[in-house]
């Protein structure tokens, strides 16, 4: 595997990561609370990767920049949108990202500008160019719509699916793999 895919077997501070997963392309989606946008992106991306027969080549997760929702499940609005698409999200509990996540992931994807600033604060910067804003993969500089304030999970779904599709294409191209659409 070429490109940004993890090739090291060094032990990171991340829990639950096996040796095999260290050879995967590792993506972490990040929002403020890890109950609405970032878990939606996590499960949409897992679904896209599965449908592309690439599940064995990816490790996908999500986290928060804040401590406000730690331990809480996916928001009911996000669960409902995922369920409408036949995507399960059981077992997810919000967690806060750590500095170690920077070393453990190839792509850290923030949902908005505020998230990006907080991610860089937590990680101490972005010397390896791993931090991206989600909508940049959909050809936009805007933020992913935040349903926490609007209640509009449909707008968030549209942003997340466009962003995830663009991100998957970007990753496949960067790692020298042909898209399996």
Where do the language-model regions lie?
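Conserved active-site segments centered on acidic
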Residues: 3, 17-104, 169-181
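Hydrophobic structural packing positions in well-ordered secondary structure
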Residues: 31, 82, 109-110, 160
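Phosphate-binding/catalytic loops
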Residues: 107, 113-181
């Amino acid at each position: 595997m070429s490109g940004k895919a993890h090739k090291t077997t060094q032990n990171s501070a991340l829990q639950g990561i096996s040796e095999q997963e260290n050879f995967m392309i590792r993506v972490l989606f990040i929002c403020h609370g890890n109950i609405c946008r970032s878990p939606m992106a996590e499960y949409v991306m897992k679904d896209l990767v599965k449908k592309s027969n690439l599940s064995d080549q990816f490790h996908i997760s999500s986290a928060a920049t804040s401590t406000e929702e730690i331990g809480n499940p996916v928001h009911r609005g996000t669960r409902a949108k995922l369920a409408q698409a036949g995507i399960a999200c059981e077992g997810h509990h919000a967690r806060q990202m750590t500095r170690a996540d920077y070393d453990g992931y190839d792509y850290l994807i923030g949902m908005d500008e505020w998230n990006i600033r907080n991610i860089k604060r937590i990680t101490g910067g972005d010397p390896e160019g791993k931090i991206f804003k989600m909508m940049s993969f959909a050809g936009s500089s805007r933020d992913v719509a935040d349903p926490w304030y609007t209640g509009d999970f449909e707008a968030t779904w549209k942003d997340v699916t466009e962003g995830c599709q663009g991100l998957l294409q970007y990753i496949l191209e960067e790692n020298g793999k042909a898209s399996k659409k």
